[in-house]
């Protein structure tokens, strides 16, 4: 758009000059073209040298042409400008030169002879007339290019010629010259592209192609339809609209096109619209001959402008200039240039000499189309090429545009070499042109109005938006050709296309309303696109173009979506409808893409989908959804794209990804479903390079995009839902896919338990199904739930289904369990059998899915009653412990018990019949059955997990349930861990509620069983058998089976009586520091309390932690502190706690006495433990003392008694036996009795150590006495925790006392 800005300025400066010198310049250029191209002046019979001077001094140039002189002054000499353009360093300085223009026209071959090339191009335009078969740029490109080229060449060729005459052009350029110089510099690059485009045969071929394409395109009458449409565009369109159409090419080409009189087209309204732009205004001819455009396209395009007559032929007597100008252009012949006097409708009035203007426009139109087309055809250039064809098509006959694009072979042939070169330059310069390209493409897609809008969008970048022109929509052919360009454009901007596509599509649909809505982008007046292209875009655009061209989409324009702005995206969207024109344009694009990386068109649909997804994703997830919807709208607008897109989808089965393949097929349906959507999406899909980019973008959200793709693939069935929920509900989408007929796949996937990422990564609905079956629990059901899964993504629903499957498994399991039940008659047999049963159940459960349901009705029915019965029993037993709430679990059992209460009762009776053994053997089988029935019971458990079943019920059948759940997990493809975790969860709940010691133990056992079940079947079976026995006993509390409880008589009796809550103890071992910290916390807590009983309880609890610390010290010999010292300090703490409450007082409460008992027990065992720790020392002391006594035994015997003498030397109690022989031997008066100090200390230490035993027994006896007063409490404690003895370990002591303290807290309401 910089070119437009530059030309606006330049045109504004040169408006009067154009009006005055236009004729001369046109004539000069025309002569130059004729000389350079060595073609007869077919189109330009007047043979005016419009660009002779500016581009290159030609023999036939009218030296006296004021316009040429002014162009030269503005643009400079061709050689000079050629050098400037050729020199990239200079190009960087040439801010005024739009890089887009340069890449559009300049080709590598034209770089040296930029303006001569232009002349040559002028000749090829003649050749185009003479050799219409010569390959040329896509018709739409040629049309827009011709129009733009006329404008560009008028400005650019003149400017180029002026640049050719650097002194003159540069001198006259003045303020516009810096930009113009940049334009010149970029024009040299553009000249390369022009060289690429400039094929004498190529240019004429464009005309023919345009002529033939119109018929090939939607408009069977390319000349008249394109001409009429173009006339309508320019005549009916407001100047801005016409300007838009011209400017949609995104370069001075627009001006040139406007200048070029299209014989069949009146450019009256259009040029003013174009001229409303800075350079287009009144200087339209000059604006179209803008130095920018001229330079960009001058070398190659200027000569190529001659195809204007061909264009007229192809469009009907419309020259690109005429079509683009939208003015009443003179006949397509150059003589009509006077007529062509570019309608000075708005800002810029074309030169006063309409004939010159017309000739110039024709020349420009004739020569420019190919260069512009080629230039824009590449990557972004492709877009601009499409854009130009779109505009030209709109201005010209849509048929012509379609012809252009529809005659890809000719264009490819003529352009192939030059177009490739120009394409490269284009790629370099097309980054900015891409913005214009979208306009061009939009123009092609849309009517002149849309073209104008697209141009306006492009304009904002380069020039102020001109008043919208009311351009009648070109025939579908125009749109189709534009679609080609726009598809590439939309590809480039596919990211934002999602949003803009719908808008653009709507614009296309409502082109008239959109006509006046060009989005004025900040004109990059100083930042010429050519500059941008030469420096920055050269590599980038080549890369993008390579990537984009790789996509062998008919759309040449595969600009990177990032580069394309929203406007471009909108244009692309409009072009999306024009995508059908792509095939014709494709040859030229193919050449460009061959350089890049041609990709099969089949990938294009995928690319579109991907791009579209990516664009949607880039915008937002919501935009993603909206974007898809919008693309749908676009597709609706362009059924052609929809048609084309499905084809690529078909072809795309081979391309990039499975997703692509999947997308190809379902997107077809989706596109079909949403015919409005295919165009934009088609464009994105054609842009496979962009699709990969989007995939890259999707890489982060890769799952979602794929999900989107899958959604798109499957969106034919659930499009909107998929779009909205695809990201969040990938699982849901897979279900939809599942219902779509992937039920078997979903099963497999579910069985495989594929991860969501894997599902996403893998293409196909199978992955989606896997995703939908994210929970492995449902995996076994996919067949039945596949269809249900899509609607029922709720885990509950799936769980319900899964529960049914579990029931099926259980039905089989019961049979196996029954088989195992027989062998497990004895308790031990049961234990042994139960593992077998579990194994069998697991094995059976795995195959069960097939036969589950068969067995389910029978075995499950029976087993369910059993479970219910057991549940009832368990519930009853659970009801016994206050902490456990059997009612909730009982209620679920009641639900099933209501159905199977009779069976449960019957089984209970059966259990009663064989009281000891049979119940146990049957219980394990029942458990096995329950395990088998756990499917049904598992349903209940699942329900419980869902909130239906209470923890008590799981507690009852936790062991069974674990096995069952495990079996289910195996059958379902779920890992045992899940089953175990579920069981553990239930167990934890049960434990939390379990108050009874036996119940808690059972729960713990069950938990262990669950884990063991997941890991070891044998161990689990044993535990499960015991647990089942205990559980059965608990459940059958009404008639306990002593045989069952024989194994655990203590637990059975106590468990039935104990109703207090049981603490859950952690078996993990910690270091001494851990326990020390815990003890300190409790001690500090006690210190903070004021209530003595609570303080005493906390001190006692802290003493237990200290005891654990001492025990840890015993385990770790490296502990610095001796465990004996720790125990000794603990004893002191306990003694202090006991002093807080006088349990001996008659006012002492039961709680005080209970606490005293616990403290005495603890003290007793601590003393005994302390003795044990010092036992070795005590033994050593004892031996030493004994030896000492032996040595002095005889003497001691002779002495009456150490203290019988005068009372002197009365031995201390420790040394009573150590009376010195002297005292014994000698008279009592003979001297004091001496005892060795060593013996004295040994005796004292020995007494201290042995005294611990005495104290221990003493405290124990005290505890026994106090216990008599609270037999029930301590009886329950003994029952729950096991009786505490003097030989109990410190761990048992701590747990026993801590449990008692817990109950004391509960009784004292301290908790």
Curated annotation (Swiss-Prot):
**Family from the record:** Belongs to the AF4 family.
Q: Where is the composition biased (Basic and acidic residues)?
A: 155-164, 582-597, 655-668, 857-867
Which sequence positions carry the modification called Phosphoserine? 430
Where is it mostly found?
nucleus
Q: In which tissues is it expressed?
A: Brain (most abundant in hippocampus and amygdala), placenta and lung.
Phosphothreonine modified-residue sites: 517
Native species: Homo sapiens (Human)
- Give the Pro residues compositional bias ranges: 465-477, 883-892, 913-922
InterPro entries, from UniProt?
A: AF4/FMR2 (IPR007797), AF4/FMR2_CHD (IPR043640), AF4_int (IPR043639)
Record's protein name: AF4/FMR2 family member 2
Cite the residue spans of the region called Disordered.
94-187, 204-229, 377-417, 457-530, 574-726, 818-867, 881-943
According to its UniProt entry, the protein's GO biological process terms are: brain development; learning or memory; mRNA processing; negative regulation of gene expression; nuclear speck organization; regulation of gene expression; regulation of RNA splicing; RNA splicing
